[in-house]
């Protein structure tokens, strides 16, 4: 007669099976303090941040879509830009304004490039859900990309031409509200009073031009922005003046 002991599973796991990683409840806290205290290397910070973005992708996208829909319905600047885009036979709404996770891009020289959104003539606007802080941030990003869309419909912008791109970046940074004094003061710790708006627009336009792969370096980015600055900064269309 066979013993019932032979049917019991072994007490010791099979050593040939690959062991699964164990959940460490303290890892998040330790990583957070490492970043706060500056002991985590920058390359590890990027990996940690990207891992967190991937883990929370659905939450971030759902929240981004709520903020997008709210601004499409209630934001004066977004509604105004929607109307002016329609007047040029364009259409931007929830169907082609999409919230997506945007991974950090590492350049050949090791620099990190992050973005809040982007415009494509073929696909519409992408909002980087993992970079959006709140509804106001979504509003500014939407307005910025809508200026690009309006420029493209109005002037058929050649986005491969750095001068064309620089002009639209100047206008988008100036007209969207992202360079208003309150945002510079509270978000970016820029406490200057005089020339604050112009300095912000120039800085952000240079940064956007530099992020394009075909821009050689910051010297070229600054030169291109300076070449088109006067005419593009003073052009507030479709607004009568700088809105914010």
From Swiss-Prot:
Entry keyword annotation includes S-adenosyl-L-methionine: no
Active site: 145
PROSITE patterns to which the protein is assigned, alphabetical: ZINC_PROTEASE (PS00142)
Keyword match Oxidoreductase: no
Topology class, membrane: Peripheral membrane protein
Listed EC numbers: 3.4.24.-
Region listing for Disordered, in residue ranges: 1-25
Protein name: Mitochondrial inner membrane protease atp23
Native source organism of the sequence: Botryotinia fuckeliana (strain B05.10) (Noble rot fungus)
Lineage: Eukaryota, Fungi, Dikarya, Ascomycota, Pezizomycotina
Chain's gene name: atp23
